[in-house]
Amino acid sequence: MNPVPWIVCIIQLTFPFLIMAQTYSPQDYPATELSNGVLRAKVYLPDAKKGFYRGTRFDWAGVIGSLEYKEHSYFGPFFEKFDPAVEDVAIGNPVVAGINSAASGPVEEFIGRDGAALGYAEAKPGETFCKIGVGALRKIDNAAYSSYVHYPIVDGGKRSVKNGPDWIEFTQELACGSGYAYRYTKTIRLLKNEPVMVIEDWLVNTGKSSIDTQVYDHNFLSIDHENTGPGSVVSFPFAPHATQDMGGLGEIRGKELLFSRNLQGNDTFYTELAGFGKQAADYEIRVENRRSRAGVVIRGDRPLVNLGIWAVRTVVAPEPYVEITVAPGEEARWKYTYQYYTVPNPGDSKTK
């Protein structure tokens, strides 16, 4: 899929569901370019008025619009159109994303073990709760929390950005309701002269309530913008087994997840995988496009607690979860490493 040429920009009004659409060309979104001479990446900047991503699901920091290695591309909008009326993603021709899911690259969502954001259960309608990386959000009613509802952003916190030629650091400081407050720093770094990107997270609990959450990295991988199909392979250091019916779209062979055919139309693949252990070494996910001969291996430094794989024809998206617990006055750090490579041709001995 070619990167989307035009994207609809959303301006959120004070009432939660009053949304206006306005058209912007891609260059209108605030961004910075990173390069280490091997990798080249475009990183979008958080901006409440003009930012590429302004939903209430994912962390606003670290949204990557593109990354290139040896003439291969890895990230870019997986959706072909944007519609604020769409709850999540409408799969078809075209693929249409709603405001909370219209993201690009590796993006993180913080979600509690109960499936809700911090402080949502305690908050009454009209009061605020806490979505790390987004802000203090207003609870609309007594319905169950949903990542796909666009809650009004009452306070986006204090944000700052620092950057150099091959790195960028985002910081958000925020006090939410129910005693939650934090300082959250994310650093994206391209290692010198290596095809490696590192994302480092640092969360400091500055509030009175303990932060007990899970966070998953939603990796929207559109390698070379080619159709998801038999050439798209996801592999692991363990033998996984699917906990849901894959609907005839996928199969597991040993340590690999394969797609049975080209996904098309409204085909949607999703399953959660079991089989990983309690060691961080199992957080190693390899995604390859064996048609274009490009791949990436994603490693985390914490044990997996859940692992989902979502795919449509334009994207393959591993969703690995880890647990984060931070007592008041304490801090937590975690890291993801992305190593990019070219897939060897049959008969070659190793990746490059």
Predicted features along the sequence, with ranges:
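Positively charged n-region of N-terminal signal peptides that target proteins for export
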Residues: 1-6
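Bacterial N-terminal signal peptides
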Residues: 8-18
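Surface-exposed acidic/polar loop and edge beta-strand patches at domain peripheries
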Residues: 22-198, 209-212, 218-352
